[in-house]
Amino acid sequence: MAKESTTIDVGEPSTVTKSSSHVVKDAKKKGFVAVASRGGAKRGLAIFDFLLRLAAIAVTIGAASVMYTAEETLPFFTQFLQFQAGYDDLPAFQYFVIAVAVVASYLVLSLPFSIVSIVRPHAVAPRLILLICDTLVVTLNTSAAAAAASITYLAHNGNQSTNWLPICQQFGDFCQNVSTAVVADSIAILFFIVLIIISAIALKRH
């Protein structure tokens, strides 16, 4: 009796599995590239944030120092009077010095959080803390600049309605110093606005 033989056909290896694995690998690769790209952008923002804080520290310390040393004594005096002008003669200027000194101290304390944002660009907590604190501190800084600016304006122009005479014609150096301090603090306010925008952009990318 002849033995029947059975033949089993083995088809060609399917390419479906291979193509699927390639798709998965490509997707993972693209995802990794996207994450790395976002991380690089956030790190760049964090570095710019750190440098801007250093600049703001220099500006605020300079503004507080110039206002603190603003003082002038006129070369003439009477038997009972000596004509002198100083920052401590006006409460608005005293408030300016104290407030801007607080702002400068905060900026120094905020540097470690900025460094953490550079090392860990995807971390949300330090960036959120900086955003909240920057918003609060810029309010303090703006109030100090506004108070000092109003008194500086009166020193330059006076007020005819209240018979307040301008004093800057006599105390030129004093007015120059306080004006410089107000301008410097206004620049610091602009720095803070940029810092807040940077933090908002970094948080939006999460």
Curated annotation (Swiss-Prot):
GO BP annotations, alphabetical order:
cell wall modification; cell-cell junction assembly
Outcome of swapping residue 158 to S: Abnormal subcellular localization
According to its UniProt record, which protein family does this protein belong to?
Belongs to the Casparian strip membrane proteins (CASP) family.
Supply the name of the protein: Casparian strip membrane protein 1
Residues exposed to the Extracellular side: 65-95, 149-180
Q: What cellular component terms from Gene Ontology apply here?
A: Casparian strip; plasma membrane
A single GO molecular-function term is: protein homodimerization activity
UniProt source species: Arabidopsis thaliana
UniProt subcellular location: Cell membrane
Q: Which UniProt keywords apply?
A: Acetylation, Cell membrane, Cell wall biogenesis/degradation, Glycoprotein, Membrane, Transmembrane, Transmembrane helix
Which InterPro entries does UniProt cross-reference here?
CASP/CASPL, CASP_dom, CASPL
Per UniProt, what does mutating residue 170 to E do?
Answer: Normal subcellular localization
- List the effects observed when the gene is inactivated: Disorganised deposition of Casparian strips.
- Membrane topology, record value: Multi-pass membrane protein
Per the annotation, which location comes first and is thus the protein's main one?
A: membrane
The residues that cross the membrane are 44-64, 96-116, 128-148, 181-201
Q: Which residues carry this modification: N-acetylalanine?
A: 2
Those parts of the protein on the Cytoplasmic side are: 2-43, 117-127, 202-206
Alphabetized PANTHER family for the sequence: CASP-LIKE PROTEIN, CASP-LIKE PROTEIN 1U1
